[in-house]
Design a protein with these regions (language model features):
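Alpha/beta catalytic cores of nucleotide-metabolism and tRNA/nucleoside-modifying enzymes
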Residues: 1-5, 17, 24-27, 46-69, ...
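Acidic, glycine-rich loop-and-beta core segments that form the ion-binding/anion-interacting portion
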Residues: 12-38, 43-48
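Conserved residues at beta->alpha junctions
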Residues: 11-12, 73
Length: 202
């Protein structure tokens, strides 16, 4: 295939890991272990690393390799933070689950609500379908509401990312990475970040 073949490898959670895969020929590396919404790797194996810190650590590589933030992306704000931390791109799983284009059949419950199955590749069910058996399973399967066309979700994510970049006054991922400033946030600060409207009792 020559230079037309792009090799993506992973997953790793350390600078040494990304350097090794780059030295072995990877063009891009998926970074993060056990951060996905239906992933149980950290619990099952005792291995893993906080997702954002993984991206920061891996971004210190001096190899010519793209960093893919993989797992734990829950909203457009998480995408902005992953890109700012050093990722060149992100992989999405749960954010796109339940869409028309996602794998699986649509089924309807007794109340007429539509759902699709969402499962990780390391789940018991996926391994049995793939290999006819399973070894150590590191994920679960779940059902998620049917969400229609994926383009609607992608459009919402795009708008959120553009807005996030505007808050930092940047026009590109490279600009964001050169100008970003991270701070530590308490759990109270995180709670404040979420919507918390109080209803008035008359």
């Amino acid at each position: 295939f020559g230079h037309a073949l792009h090799i993506m490898a992973g997953n790793v959670a350390t600078l040494q890991g990304i350097n090794d895969l780059a030295d072995w020929g990877a063009n891009s590396v998926r970074c993060n272990i056990g951060g996905g919404s239906i992933c149980s790797t950290r619990i099952q194996t005792g291995h893993g690393h906080p997702g954002l810190q993984t991206i920061i650590d891996c971004s210190h590589t001096d190899r010519d390799v793209a960093i893919i933030a993989d797992g734990g992306i829950r909203n457009s704000g998480d995408i902005v933070k992953a890109l700012a931390a050093g990722a060149d791109a992100v992989m999405l799983g749960s954010l796109l689950s339940g869409t028309r284009e996602a794998p699986g059949e649509v089924f309807t419950d007794a109340q007429g609500r539509k759902y699709k199955t969402y499962r990780g590749m390391a789940s018991k069910e996926a391994q049995v379908d793939w290999r006819g058996k399973y070894s150590s399973f590191e994920g679960v399967s779940s059902t998620v509401p049917y969400r229609g066309k994926v383009r609607n979700i992608l459009s919402d994510l795009e708008r959120g990312i553009r807005s996030g970049f505007s808050y930092s006054g940047v026009r590109s991922i490279e600009e964001m990475q050169h100008n970003v400033q991270f701070i530590r946030q308490t759990s109270a600060g995180l709670g404040e970040s979420r919507t918390h409207i109080q209803t008035r009792k008359w």
